[in-house]
């Protein structure tokens, strides 16, 4: 599973860049340079996803648009969304039992304000029939 969302970058008349996310109309930002615009895009995506999780607003799967930039949110948000998507409609109680932990501890795995350990993520992935895979970009 991949948690990168497509964003269009448009060069503005004043030599800055405007960034707009295809899947979130409320998520847009800008930057004076391409590097700054991409950094700001990751920040605004992280904030948007955090807000949607906190408010219980549905989060769409990333659209597949080859010609747009793919932007990833923070690792904490990615981890929370990956666990959420892998768990799907299974109750937290089932995940908690598989992890031999409490229901609140299992629920925290889907909270981007908490920092699960790699061991917790590996165990959650295994309990959900998945494998944890990491990469640097």
What label would you give each PLM region?
Residues 1-49, 53-54:
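DNA-contacting interfaces and partner/effector-binding or oligomerization modules
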Residues 33, 91-92, 117-120:
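Residues that mark the N-terminal boundary/hinge immediately upstream of a DNA-recognition element
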Residues 53-61:
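Short, charge-rich, low-complexity interaction segments located
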Residues 64-89:
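A short, Lys/Arg-rich alpha-helix, primarily the initiator
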Residues 89-108:
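Short alpha-helical DNA-recognition segment
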Residues 100, 111-112, 129:
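Central "turn" residue of the DNA-binding helix-turn-helix
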Residues 108, 112, 123:
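Alpha-helical DNA-recognition elements
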Residues 119-135:
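DNA major-groove recognition helix of helix-turn-helix/homeodomain DNA-binding modules
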């Amino acid at each position: 599973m991949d948690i990168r969302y497509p964003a269009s970058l448009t060069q503005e008349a004043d030599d800055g860049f405007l960034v707009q996310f295809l899947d979130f109309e409320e998520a847009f930002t800008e930057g004076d340079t391409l590097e700054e615009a991409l950094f700001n895009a990751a920040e605004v995506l992280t904030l948007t996803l955090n807000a949607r999780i906190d408010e219980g607003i549905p989060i769409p799967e990333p659209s597949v648009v080859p010609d747009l930039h793919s932007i990833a949110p923070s690792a904490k948000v990615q981890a929370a969304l990956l666990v959420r998507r892998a768990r799907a409609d299974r109750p937290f109680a089932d995940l908690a039992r598989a992890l031999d932990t409490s229901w609140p501890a299992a629920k925290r795995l889907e909270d981007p304000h908490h920092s699960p350990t790699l061991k917790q993520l590996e165990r959650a992935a295994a309990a959900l029939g998945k494998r944890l895979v990491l990469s640097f970009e």
